[in-house]
């Protein structure tokens, strides 16, 4: 997958026994399936929180990313949610089996993913504000920042956490990878060198997935999914575009688990009134 090729995820990889290691470890390729498996396992609590929020809410709201991910289940009607849960559970089992032979220290690696996500969540808001200030030309709308208010309901907080995980799976893992691979294959087909093709693929995947991420928060682009979405506001759109680029970079560098927990904890902070009013 394009999201993890050439990335250094060795910090989250468990060393094999000596006889399983290649003679030259520096030449060994990154363990893409292992990285994705660890990332999905780290996302499991977030996805479970999302399912719980849907089950306990009187009028459940669904994430746009989740609707897009599982739109192919619509013909199943009322059984679609059971099929979705079955797919998520099956993926979890596959990931557990993939990581079984490297299970020693797995809990520590998962805690490192969560801790790193919390750290990046703290750094993300000031980084986005600095970038929007440096770019200039747009001003935050009135009421963009709020003071901490009453604590949200538990179901709402669970939804916010789980929706972030679905957005990382859809916009970063799937869409980023798809755009990257498509652009890379096309560049090679038209005679570009492999290095050039990779760079173009990275740019197309990173910016393209971030642009779609920002656009699918707007009513103009979500009418085909049903009600919901916001009116276009330049600052908020730029904010989300930059957020998508930052999260895509995190995914590429640190893996999907870190990106998902960064996104989830950042949005939870916004919900609690810790920063800008508009979540992304």
Q: Where are the regions that the model predicts?
A:
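Membrane-interfacial, low-structure loops and terminal tails that flank and connect transmembrane helices
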Residues: 8-33, 108, 187-199
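Alpha-helical transmembrane segments and their helix-start/interface "positive-inside/aromatic belt" motifs
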Residues: 27-43, 105-119, 257-260
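Alpha-helical transmembrane segments
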Residues: 36-50, 119-121, 206-212
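Alpha-helical transmembrane segments of multi-pass membrane proteins
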Residues: 42-63, 128-133
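Juxtamembrane helix-loop-helix connectors linking adjacent transmembrane helices
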Residues: 69, 73, 101-166, 180-196
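Interfacial helix-start motif at the membrane-water boundary
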Residues: 70-90
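Central hydrophobic cores of alpha-helical transmembrane segments in multi-pass inner-membrane proteins
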Residues: 88-101
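Transmembrane helix-loop-helix hairpins at the membrane interface
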Residues: 154-280
């Amino acid at each position: 997958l394009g999201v993890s090729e050439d990335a250094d995820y060795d910090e989250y990889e468990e060393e094999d026994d000596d006889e399983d290691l290649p003679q030259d470890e520096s030449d060994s390729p990154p363990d893409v399936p292992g990285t994705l498996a660890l990332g999905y396992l780290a996302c499991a609590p977030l996805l479970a929180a999302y399912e719980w929020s849907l089950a306990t809410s009187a009028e459940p709201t669904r994430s746009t990313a989740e609707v897009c991910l599982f739109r192919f289940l619509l013909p199943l009607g009322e059984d679609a949610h059971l099929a979705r849960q079955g797919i998520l559970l099956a993926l979890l089992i596959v990931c557990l089996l993939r990581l079984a032979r490297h299970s020693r220290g797995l809990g520590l690696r998962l805690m490192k993913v969560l801790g790193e996500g919390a750290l990046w969540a703290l750094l993300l808001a000031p980084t986005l504000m600095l970038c929007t200030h440096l770019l200039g030309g747009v001003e935050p709308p009135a009421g963009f920042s709020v003071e901490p208010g009453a604590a949200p309901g538990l179901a709402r907080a669970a939804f916010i956490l789980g929706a972030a995980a679905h957005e990382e799976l859809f916009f970063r893992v799937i869409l980023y990878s798809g755009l990257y691979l498509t652009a890379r294959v096309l560049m090679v087909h038209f005679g570009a060198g492999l290095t050039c093709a990779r760079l173009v693929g990275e740019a197309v995947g990173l910016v393209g997935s971030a642009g779609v991420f920002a656009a699918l928060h707007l009513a103009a682009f979500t009418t085909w999914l049903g009600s919901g979405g916001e009116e276009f506001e330049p600052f908020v759109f730029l904010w989300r575009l930059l957020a998508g680029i930052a999260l895509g970079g995190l995914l590429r560098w640190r893996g999907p688990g870190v990106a998902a927990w960064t996104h989830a904890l950042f949005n939870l902070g916004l919900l609690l009134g810790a920063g800008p009013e508009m979540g992304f």
